C-alpha cells in the first residue's frame, strides 16, 4: 500500500519573522527552562553524551554556565562513576566526603591520590575517621624520599583551624577570612571528620550565580546508560555517585526494549529523572512518556556527522520532528530536547520556537578545550577529533 508523502522542514528551511520587542537589554532576558520534569536549567543548552564531547570537564563548564552535561557511556562503569564524582566534587558548599589518607601512607601514596583525584590536598584521618592532620601539595614540594610517611609531612591537628559540623556558610566564610586558610575541615566534638569547606568553592560560587546546582549546592550532571545487560547495575552506581538524570542512550528509542528499560529504571530509581530517546514522531513521544520518561530526546539522523539516515533511510526533518513531538508532549508537560541538527545559534532559536525546552549540542562544542577529543595538528593548526555515535 503506498504511503502518502507529506512536506516536512528542517532548520535551514525556515526563518523567524521579526516582531516588536519590549526588551531593553539582553540582560533582561530569562532563558531558564526545564531539562526534564524536575530539573531546571538556567540556559537551554545540554552537551551531548558523546565520547568526544562530554566528560567531567565539559559537564563542569556546562553546569557553571547554567546548562548541563551528560557523561557518555562509552567507558567502564567505574570510569563513568568517577567522572560523575568529579563533577559533584568540583564545587560544593560543603564537601560531605572529602578525600582522605591514613597517617601511615607514604608520600608516593599521597602524590598518586592527589593526581588521581585532581586535588591539591588530603585530610589525614585515623582508623576511627578522626581528623589528625592535613597534607597538601606544598608539603611535598621539596621532599625527595617517596617513602616518607604522611604523618611526618602533614600539618598536625593541633595546628589546624577547624569548624563545627553544623557551621553555616556565612560562619565558614568568616573563619576562612579570619584565619587566612584555604581549607576548613568540619568536625564534631570528638574530632570525627564530617566534611570540608574550601575558599576556592566560596569564590567560585560567588563568581557563578547562574550555575545549575542540586539541593546540596553541587553542580548538576547527567549520565547516559544503554539497554544491554548490566544497564541497571550501571544506573544504580551512577545514581549513588550523584547523577541527577539518567539518559537512555540509543539510536532508535521507539522500541519495546527501550520502553521496558524506562519502566524498570523508574521503578528501581524513582528519585532521578529519566530522559529517553531518540524518537522523531508523535507516536514515539507518547509511548516514551507513557512508559515513564521525564523528558524526551527528539532527533533521528539529524546530527552533523550522523549517518543513520544514509544507512537506514529512516528519519524526519528535524524542525518538523521537534514541532510534532512537542505538540504530542504538551498535555503531559514533559519537556522535549532537540537533539541534532544544531549547527549555529539561529538553529537553537528555531528549535525553541517550535516547542523544544532545550537543545543538545555536540559538534559545536567538540572543538573546545573542555571536550575530551584528541587534539591533532594539521598544517600548523590545532583540531580536535570528533565522531558520531548511537
Question: How does the language model describe each region?
Answer:
Residues 40-46, 93-98, 214-224, 265-280, ...:
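Short beta-strand/loop segments at the ligand-binding rim of alpha/beta enzyme cores
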Residues 71-74, 100-101, 121-123, 162-163, ...:
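Catalytic beta/alpha-barrel core
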Residues 27, 76-85, 143-147, 192-212, ...:
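Active-site-adjacent beta->alpha loops and helix N-cap segments on the catalytic face
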Residues 57-60, 233-241, 274, 280-298, ...:
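Catalytic cores of alpha/beta
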Residues 25-42, 48-50, 79-117, 124-126, ...:
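Bateman/CBS regulatory modules and CBS-like beta-alpha motifs in cytosolic regions of diverse proteins
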Residues 72-76, 119, 123, 130-146, ...:
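Short beta->alpha transition motifs characteristic of CBS
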Residues 1-20, 24, 101-102, 163-164, ...:
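Alpha/beta catalytic cores of nucleotide-metabolism and tRNA/nucleoside-modifying enzymes
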Residues 64-79, 243-255, 294-312, 342-375:
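Glycine-rich phosphate-binding active-site loops on the catalytic face of alpha/beta enzymes
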